[in-house]
Amino acid sequence: TNLRVTPLYIICQGHDGCFQSPPDVDSSIDSACSRIAVGAKLIQSLTAEKLFECGVGRKTFQLEHEITLKKPECIVFKSNLNVNKARKMRQADLWSHFGRELMLSDLGSNERKFLGFISCTRFKGTDIDKPMTHDEIVSFTEAYAALGGGGLALFGTACLYTWPTTVKDIIPKFLDSTPVNNRRFMDDSGYRGTLGGCFATTLGSVFHELGHTFDLGHTKDGIMGRGFDNIDRVFLVGDRRSSLTKDNMNNYNGKPVQHSTVSLQRNISVTMNVAEPLRVLGPRSKTTLGNFASLSKSDIIRRSPNITPIQRPSSVYSNISNRMSDSKKNVNRINGNDPIYWTRNCAVLLSYHRWFNNEYGRERQAITRYLKFDKNKMLIISTAGIRIVEVRDESNGMVLDSYEFTNPLPEKRFLVPFTFSPKSKVLTIVVEDDLGNVLKQT
């Protein structure tokens, strides 16, 4: 397949490309690219291992340099956006701008999902002595982003100095207990306050946001839940691992960190990609919808901004007779040791996803395939066969229920076993067929 993830180091106009770091840390463009390349490979391998643990094989995405051998492991992208303007923009606006700019550039392609890091992110510094919340820390940070959806996962670089430049430095970086100088540098460590915590939380955030570009929604637990900032526990053993704590929503993790989600639609009969990022913060915050401006290389549906509080899965679905059985639930429930896992629905969706499978020989088949959801009859029809159906809360992307079909011969029809109620929240039906086509309908 030619489908790939493309790591980028985005340098704004008027910026020298050096990321913020202490004076004893190499913050050059080459150093940034080395750190991003190592991080991308870590996520690539971790994706495969965690899918293997779910019993679907070691599947993962390809990186740009594995497809185009002449390309570097991390591409430097010179943006036309002025650095001063970028530092005044909200992360949703940065996501929209860079997404549009990338698609209109020579790199623009529907065969790429971009993993971008903004060089000019800057923590302005503070004299505040009291501990700050994540939102307060972000308010002191310019050109900050941690947002994924559609074809772009975008991040700031305020903690990139805590990342390793080589494979041999990975474990020492996770184990680095040096306190963050939180008056001069961003502390995005899940409230652990260490350089190792910053590396773990920000790498885990990249893992989570990249998952949204692969059409994953939020889950109560696991990688697409709130466990991702303990990613260091996958690589460390014994007493050296960071301890798991619970937040006030009874979730295992460090502390509240930022989440985002995406609403992506693909029309099966025509080529159309629809993407919107949905920013989801800590348990007492709000969610905010952003949107792409129209692109020449893809159809974008615009939606007006919507602000809504975060909701957890509703108990209204607890009585559904066809709810997923115990055998379909997560095989890696949080046990105090490993909160980093794909829930079963995420594993199934990824295992059939176009970015995780060989495209050759399936493209001609896909032309004649039919995938449709009849909202009136609550009936899904797929000529290729249905592999997974998810019911999500449209406001925050939370997966409320899922139905997986992993037998060799998948279902061609599926009647969603509930009806919409005027009092219920707005729901989105997400369907993936045997060829990896994804349909979303609200």
What are these regions (language model features)?
Residues 1-152, 157-158, 201, 399-407:
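Propeptide-to-catalytic entry region of secreted or membrane-anchored zinc metalloproteases
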Residues 14-18, 124-126, 162-164, 221-223, ...:
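Eukaryotic short linear interaction motifs
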Residues 20-23, 167, 218, 236-239:
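Short coil/turn segments at secondary-structure boundaries
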Residues 48, 52, 215-219, 229:
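Short amphipathic alpha-helices and their capping/turn residues within compact interaction modules
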Residues 126-196:
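Active-site scaffold of zinc-dependent metalloenzymes
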Residues 200-217:
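Active-site recognition of the HExxH zinc-binding catalytic motif
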Residues 436-442:
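Edge beta-strands of extracellular beta-sandwich domains
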